[in-house]
Swiss-Prot record:
Protein name: Thiamine-phosphate synthase
GO cellular component: cytoplasm
Keywords: Magnesium, Metal-binding, Thiamine biosynthesis, Transferase
Pfam families in the cross-refs: TMP-TENI
Enzyme Commission number(s): 2.5.1.3
Residues at which 2-[(2R,5Z)-2-carboxy-4-methylthiazol-5(2H)-ylidene]ethyl phosphate binds: 134-136, 163, 183-184
SUPFAM superfamilies per record: Thiamin phosphate synthase
Protein family according to the UniProt entry: Belongs to the thiamine-phosphate synthase family.
Organism of provenance: Enterococcus faecalis (strain ATCC 700802 / V583)
Record field: transmembrane: none
Its job: Condenses 4-methyl-5-(beta-hydroxyethyl)thiazole monophosphate (THZ-P) and 2-methyl-4-amino-5-hydroxymethyl pyrimidine pyrophosphate (HMP-PP) to form thiamine monophosphate (TMP).
Gene3D superfamilies for this protein: Aldolase class I
Cofactor(s) named in the record: Mg(2+)
Catalytic EC class: transferase
C-alpha cells in the first residue's frame, strides 16, 4: 500500500473538456503517478459515473489504482480500487462493510484521535491536511507537528495533502508520511511529464531521509 501512495494525483476539472481532462490524467499516469483519485463535487451521479468509467480505462491501462472521492456507490459501480472519505461522510466501519475487505479505504484525518479511530474501523491509509495553503481545501491548516503525530500514532500509511508543490515537499522530511497528494500542481502543469518526474525525484529524496 505504501508504494502506491508516493505521488498521488487527485483530479481537478477546472475548465478542461473531457478530452483534455482525460489526456492530462493519461499523461500523468504514463509519467509516473502512483495512484489517481477521481474527485467530482458538483456533477450529477450519472455524470460522475460516466467520467469514472472513462478514467478507469486510463488507470487500468497503466495498472494504477483508481480511488473514488466520497462516493461508495460510484466506487462499486465501476469496480474502482477503492474510495476516499472525508470527515462528514459515512462512518469508516460502514464503508468498509459496504465495499468489502479487498477495496482500499482512505480517510481524511486532521487529528490523532480521528486517525486512530479510522485505522481501528478499517481504513487502509490516511490523508492529512491541508498542510500548506490551498484553494482546493478551505479548512484550517494542519501543522507539520500534527502531521508527524498522526503518522506516529497509526500503523497505516499517511499521505500529506493540501498545497503540496515540488518546492515544499522537502519540508515533509521527518514527518513519517508515505507520500504526497497533489491536484493543481499536476493538473495545471504546462509540462505534466516533466512535473511528475520532478515530483517523483523530490518525493523519493524526502522518503529516503526517513530511513
Amino acid at each position: 500500500m505504501r508504494e502506491k501512495l508516493k505521488v498521488y494525483l487527485v483530479t481537478g476539472r477546472y475548465d478542461f473538456s473531457d478530452t483534455e481532462f482525460l489526456k492530462r490524467i493519461e499523461t500523468a499516469c504514463r509519467s509516473g503517478v502512483t495512484l489517481v483519485q477521481l474527485r467530482e463535487k458538483e456533477v450529477s451521479t450519472r455524470r460522475f459515473y460516466e467520467l469514472a468509467v472513462k478514467v478507469k480505462v486510463v488507470t487500468d491501462a497503466y495498472q494504477i489504482p483508481l480511488i473514488i472521492n466520497d462516493r461508495v456507490d460510484i466506487c462499486l459501480a465501476v469496480d474502482a480500487a477503492g474510495v476516499h472519505i472525508g470527515d462528514d461522510e459515512l462512518p469508516v466501519a460502514l464503508v468498509r462493510k459496504l465495499v468489502g475487505s479487498t477495496k482500499i479505504v482512505g480517510v481524511s484525518a486532521k487529528t490523532v484521535a480521528r486517525g486512530v479511530e479510522a485505522e481501528n474501523e478499517g481504513a487502509d491509509y490516511l490523508g492529512v491536511g491541508a498542510i500548506f495553503p490551498t484553494t482546493t481545501k478551505d479548512s484550517p491548516l494542519t501543522s507539520l507537528q500534527t502531521l508527524s503525530e498522526i503518522a506516529a500514532a497509526v500503523t497505516i500509511p499517511v499521505v500529506a495533502i493540501g498545497g503540496i508543490k515540488e518546492e515544499n515537499i522537502e519540508q515533509l522530511m521527518g514527518t513519517g508520511v508515505a507520500g504526497v497528494s497533489l491536484v493543481s500542481e499536476i493538473m495545471l502543469a504546462e509540462q505534466i511529464t516533466e512535473k511528475v518526474q520532478g515530483l517523483m525525484r523530490v518525493t523519493e529524496r524526502m522518503l529516503e531521509a526517513r530511513k
